[in-house]
């Protein structure tokens, strides 16, 4: 993961947003397998649980196994075929999501060697808002930022 580019700016921005809105007393369910940002959250005092690589499009049981007070999905919803069902199965009342916004000139990203490293959705901001609204979530804070990959 991140062999060629490490997303320092995105991680710093995401951590600042997390620290602004979430206490380190909370337990976070971070959607996806343990990753570099999971480690950053832990290094900053957060208790982090992760899913274990199951196909969340067809099986959301991982969201029921452990108790958590915050659900995070950082740069992962674009990989799911069915983020609607995942959002319906979240078992807490705090949610933090980040997504790469769709650029009008870019095709969906697709790795030819890793089936988990593919984008099914390329969201526009209104589409994420609609998805959250349809699944009963209320947006209370948001930030948009750029993440230049080559810098």
Regions found by a protein language model. Name each.
Residues 76, 100, 145-147:
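Flexible loop residues that form catalytic
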Residues 97-121:
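Short, glycine-/aromatic-enriched active-site segment of Class I SAM-dependent methyltransferases
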């Amino acid at each position: 993961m991140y062999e060629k580019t490490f997303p320092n700016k995105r991680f710093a921005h995401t951590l600042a947003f997390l620290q602004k809105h979430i206490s380190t007393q909370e337990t976070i369910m971070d959607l996806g397998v343990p990753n570099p940002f999971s480690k950053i959250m832990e290094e900053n005092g957060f208790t982090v649980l992760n899913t274990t690589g199951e196909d969340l499009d067809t099986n959301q049981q991982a969201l029921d196994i452990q108790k958590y007070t915050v659900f995070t999905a950082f740069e992962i919803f674009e990989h799911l075929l069915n983020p609607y069902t995942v959002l319906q199965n979240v078992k807490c009342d705090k949610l933090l999501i980040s997504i790469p916004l769709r650029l009008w000139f870019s095709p969906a990203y697709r790795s030819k060697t890793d089936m988990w490293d593919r984008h099914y959705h390329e969201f526009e901001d209104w589409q994420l808002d609609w998805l959250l609204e349809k699944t009963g979530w209320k947006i209370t804070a948001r930030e948009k930022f750029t993440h230049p990959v080559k810098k």
